[in-house]
Amino acid sequence: MPTWRRAITSGRSCSRLAVSDPILHEDPRSGNCYKIKLTAALLGLPLATRQYDILAGETRTPEFLANVNPNGRIPVLEIDDRFLPESNAACWYLAGDSALIPRDRFAQAEMLRWMFFEQNSHEPNIATLRFWLHFVGAAQLSPQQKAQMMAKRIAGCDALASMDRHLAKRDWFVGGAVSLADIALFAYTHTAEEGGFGLGDYPSIGAWLDRMRDLPDFIPMQ
């Protein structure tokens, strides 16, 4: 096993997580779902999946709302008879005491800072435009959605610029190694061009994306 992999998986055991393998309720087109699969892959953890088509309303059925998530959203990580929504919470659960979470308390806070940034400044803009343009289609957008596009484009570019400035001075978002912050931000950054964002404008992000893809046990998004 490579030294990097030993460090990441140190102290991890699937039996410490759950009696049975965790199950990810997901749509494979979702970057939020992909984060969880990438975390499990880097840690060498087994992860079953159950797939839903969000465009077909499969997460809004009475059965899903009653048994998986009353909010009608995915991803949801099922651990034995418990259900954990929110992608970054699920990644945190899987990573536990592995090296994907820094041991230093300030570094942990920095990691969380970037994970909050991803959910508040990055994902609402970049992921939303990707969904609207790549899956829904510009012609199918409502007038309200079309009116929001410019603001989301500007905010998404601002988020990418912040990331690029940060990565100009370092290889990873926190410390000297990959962490959950990198996984959280990779998911929708590497698909940003599907939302009309030009990643060629951000060379430090481009180099970081290559480093992520070169990690042992990396898996691509389906």
Q: For the regions a protein language model found, what residue spans apply to each?
A:
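GST-like domain detector, emphasizing the conserved glutathione-binding G-site
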Residues: 7, 11-147, 164
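GST-like fold's C-terminal all-alpha helical module
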Residues: 115-211
